[in-house]
């Protein structure tokens, strides 16, 4: 593709030159000239008043959208264990499938993973597309994307959902490019438009300060990655059965360009905040980064982990992996302690579905108390030691 200027139409108005974000356009002898810095962004095409600029080599792909049916969930597994986010996607996928009157399917890749299909059926899948091959034992972008791309081309799903995990965030954009469709990343809400039956994908934007709803009107499949912990887990029914469709998982030399030499698991003793049943979270009300040591004492007593707010991450007090909120991780622990956290809407969105929320704050008017099940107005440096003392008394 290249940007071309039709000299006979160009009037040398310089609007394209002023609009170019890469300074790639000059005006020579009253004619626009496109330089090597051009990235084909197309901004100049939109502003040209005489339609003297066009993009060569582009053909609009017109798809028969009626050919695409079914909601697919990428059934991510690691070492023979299905990731928890898959069950959340099956729950949400079933709702979407019911609204548009189609079936819910899972696509499973791996080596010797056929026995996992029963678990996918139990969580609501009507069909499972299975690719089982030694080359798929460990995740590679080339291997997984080849198989799923071929399956999408053959079976034409209407919607494909992925967990916003490390693997999902790598695989989904690769497939979106391969099948020439759009992708909405890190969605926190999915719904079907009642009028046109397209999926409305909502995700945080501009640092979580607003929520953007995105649609994919002309391309299929519609693709989304969804954050773990956002959607409700599907109901489990072991009596549910379905159809297994085996995919061709044949690879030629050179299809997979990378080789996994070793998987080094984290050596940290901390529990992931997305998996923890008990979370003790601290905000700027701690007053100092050393305050997290006190929170860790309480978390250790409960067998939980420490989390934080975005403000503490921005201040360099804590790591982003510990951040709860729209721009961090969404969590659903049994108990969530909010210590010195004021309760910004972005943070609340990431923890409001916790079973029990306990807020500790000096400011009795802090917004966090509006969502808390129990609120303690006081100095956290006095309250938390008192809680630890009581836990010691009961043998915790």
Curated annotation (Swiss-Prot):
Q: Which InterPro entries match?
A: 4Fe4S_Fe-S-bd, 4Fe4S_Fe_S_CS, DHS-like_NAD/FAD-binding_dom, ETF_a/b_N, ETF_a/FixB, ETF_alpha_N, ETF_asu_C, Rossmann-like_a/b/a_fold
**Cofactor(s) it depends on:** FAD; [4Fe-4S] cluster
Top EC class, one word: oxidoreductase
GO CC aspect terms: cytoplasm
Summarize where FAD binds, as residue positions. 335-363
Q: What is its EC number?
A: 1.3.1.108
Q: Which Pfam families match?
A: ETF, ETF_alpha, Fer4_21
Q: Which domain of life is it from?
A: Bacteria
Alphabetically ordered keywords of this record: 4Fe-4S, Cytoplasm, FAD, Flavoprotein, Iron, Iron-sulfur, Metal-binding, NAD, Oxidoreductase
Compartments, record wording: Cytoplasm
Iron-sulfur as a keyword? yes
Chief location of this protein within or outside the cell: cytoplasm
Q: Which reaction does it catalyse?
A: hydrocaffeoyl-CoA + 2 reduced [2Fe-2S]-[ferredoxin] + 2 NAD(+) = (E)-caffeoyl-CoA + 2 oxidized [2Fe-2S]-[ferredoxin] + 2 NADH
- Could you cite one Gene Ontology molecular function of this protein? electron transfer activity
Spell out the PANTHER family in the cross-references.
ELECTRON TRANSFER FLAVOPROTEIN ALPHA (PTHR43153), ELECTRON TRANSFER FLAVOPROTEIN SUBUNIT ALPHA, MITOCHONDRIAL (PTHR43153:SF1)
The protein in question is named Caffeyl-CoA reductase-Etf complex subunit CarE
């Amino acid at each position: 593709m290249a940007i071309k200027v039709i000299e006979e139409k160009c009037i040398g108005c310089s609007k394209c030159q002023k609009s170019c974000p890469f300074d790639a356009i000059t005006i020579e002898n009253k004619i626009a000239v496109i330089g090597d810095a051009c990235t084909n962004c197309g901004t100049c095409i939109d502003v040209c008043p005489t339609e003297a600029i066009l993009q060569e080599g582009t053909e609009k792909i017109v798809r028969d959208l009626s050919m695409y049916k079914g909601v697919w969930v990428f059934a991510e597994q690691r070492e023979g264990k299905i990731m928890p986010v898959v069950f959340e996607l099956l729950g949400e996928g079933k709702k979407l499938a019911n609204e548009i009157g189609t079936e819910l399917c899972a696509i499973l890749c791996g080596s010797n993973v056929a026995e996992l299909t029963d678990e996918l059926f139990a969580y609501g899948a009507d069909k499972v597309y299975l690719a089982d091959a030694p080359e798929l034992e460990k995740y590679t972008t080339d291997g997984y994307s080849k198989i799923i791309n071929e399956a999408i081309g053959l079976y034409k799903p209407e919607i494909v959902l992925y967990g916003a995990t490390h693997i999902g965030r790598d695989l989904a954009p690769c497939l979106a490019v391969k099948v020439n469709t759009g992708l909405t990343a890190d969605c926190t809400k999915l719904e079907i438009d009642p009028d046109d039956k397209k999926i409305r994908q909502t995700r945080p934007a501009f640092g979580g300060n607003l929520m953007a709803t995105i649609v994919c009107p002309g391309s299929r499949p519609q693709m989304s990655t969804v954050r773990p912990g956002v959607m409700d887990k599907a109901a489990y029914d072991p009596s549910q059965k379905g159809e297994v469709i085996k995919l061709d998982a044949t690879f030629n030399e050179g299809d997979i360009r990378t080789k996994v030499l070793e998987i080094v698991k984290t050596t940290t003793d901390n529990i992931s905040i997305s998996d923890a049943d008990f979370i003790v979270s601290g905000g700027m009300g701690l007053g100092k980064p050393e305050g997290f040591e006190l929170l860790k004492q309480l978390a250790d007593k409960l067998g939980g982990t420490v989390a934080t707010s975005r403000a503490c991450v921005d201040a360099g007090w804590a790591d982003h992996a510990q951040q709860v909120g729209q721009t961090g991780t969404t969590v659903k622990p049994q108990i969530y302690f909010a210590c010195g956290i004021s309760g910004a809407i972005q943070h609340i969105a990431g923890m409001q579905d916790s079973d029990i929320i306990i807020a500790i704050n000096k400011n009795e008017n802090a917004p966090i108390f509006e969502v808390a099940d129990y609120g303690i107005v006081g100095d956290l440096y006095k309250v938390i030691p008192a809680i630890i003392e009581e836990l010691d008394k009961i043998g915790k």
